[in-house]
Amino acid sequence: AASYKVTFVTPSGTNTITCPADTYVLDAAEESGLDLPYSCRAGACSSCAGKVTAGAVNQEDGSFLEEEQMEAGWVLTCVAYPTSDVTIETHKEEDLTA
């Protein structure tokens, strides 16, 4: 499978990892030792919410986000596959639910 560079912009700094196209970005982050927020791991809540600022993801497995939210860049990292090199701002649940 193809792999993409996924950059996570977190409150404690920026980390770039390599994520296979068939791996959720949250799983790849954890395998790389990054500590990102999550809860259900099923795309049904907002704990892992982030904002895509560059690139693209496939998050068809998620159910929580509305179409408009996804079009605005919101992403649930637990159900997002990278479809290009992508940059994601993490720890965004408060902004999403505000």
Curated annotation (Swiss-Prot):
Occurrences of domain 2Fe-2S ferredoxin-type (ranges): 4-94
Any one biological process term the GO annotation gives: electron transport chain
Primary localisation category: plastid
Location in or out of the cell: Plastid, Chloroplast
Pfam families named among the record's database cross-references: Fer2
Needed co-factor(s): [2Fe-2S] cluster
Cofactor info, note text: Binds 1 [2Fe-2S] cluster.
Binding site for [2Fe-2S] cluster: C40, C45, C48, C78
Record GO terms (molecular function): 2 iron, 2 sulfur cluster binding; electron transfer activity; metal ion binding
GO CC aspect terms: chloroplast stroma
SUPFAM superfamilies associated with the record: 2Fe-2S ferredoxin-like (SSF54292)
Family, per entry: Belongs to the 2Fe2S plant-type ferredoxin family.
Purpose: Ferredoxins are iron-sulfur proteins that transfer electrons in a wide variety of metabolic reactions.
Protein's recorded name: Ferredoxin-2
Taxonomic source organism: Phytolacca americana (American pokeweed)
